[in-house]
Amino acid sequence: MAFLTIAPGAFAQAPAPASLSAEDKALVDKAVSYLQGLTEARGRFTQTDARGATSQGELFLKRPGKARFAYDPPSGLLVVSDGGAVAIQDTRLKTFDSYPLMATPLSLFLARTIRLDRGVQVTRVSRAADGFTITARDGKKQTAGQITLTFADNPMTLRGWSVTDAQGRTTQVRIDGLERVSGLDPGLFVLKDPRPKNVGRGKL
């Protein structure tokens, strides 16, 4: 999967959750409060896959549930979450796939109510000079997922995330210039299946 390894079951096994200190918990609460208040935003993203290949594009967020990742040419990739499903269209490869939002890492910060103490297990909180990271897994599934969210301090900003798949390959997404906006076009978060009804899944 080209984008963020979002296919169901794509997560690697995560370590057992660590005991969080009071300072760790305060940072988790700070991150949750920030994400909960991030209702509409746009910015640029750079994705780096396990082979080191990079691609860029424009990101739109409209919480709860909605996101759009429009990749720059020559990539033909477009990823859209409409609140219930994440659709992935590749016009170059002529493919179209769809997954339940709740089966993807995006659900961690697109949920209506973000909870990192229910159904999600925080395994690590790490500090840096200009921010911090939170590593978490989905505690609801038999296959534990692992995603690391990166935040900057002063001002508080989501910098990006990384996901490791079942083969131990990591895909990283860095966000630049994320800004709060309002009135995003609802059409940004609609991606209809272009395939004729008699065409099998994945092929246009």
Give, region by region, the residue ranges found by the protein language model.
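Boundary at the C-terminal end of the N-terminal hydrophobic targeting segment
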Residues: 10-18
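Bacterial N-terminal signal peptides
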Residues: 1-7
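Flexible, surface-exposed loop/linker segments and immediately adjacent secondary-structure boundaries
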Residues: 93-140
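A short, Trp-centered hydrophobic/proline-enriched beta-strand micro-motif
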Residues: 33-50
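An acidic-aromatic
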Residues: 14, 58-108, 171, 177
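Extracytoplasmic
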Residues: 38-40, 54-56, 62-66, 73-74, ...
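Solvent-exposed strand-loop boundary residues in beta-sheet-rich modules
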Residues: 49-51, 92, 167
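Gly/Pro-enriched, hydrophobic low-complexity segments
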Residues: 117-119, 127-204
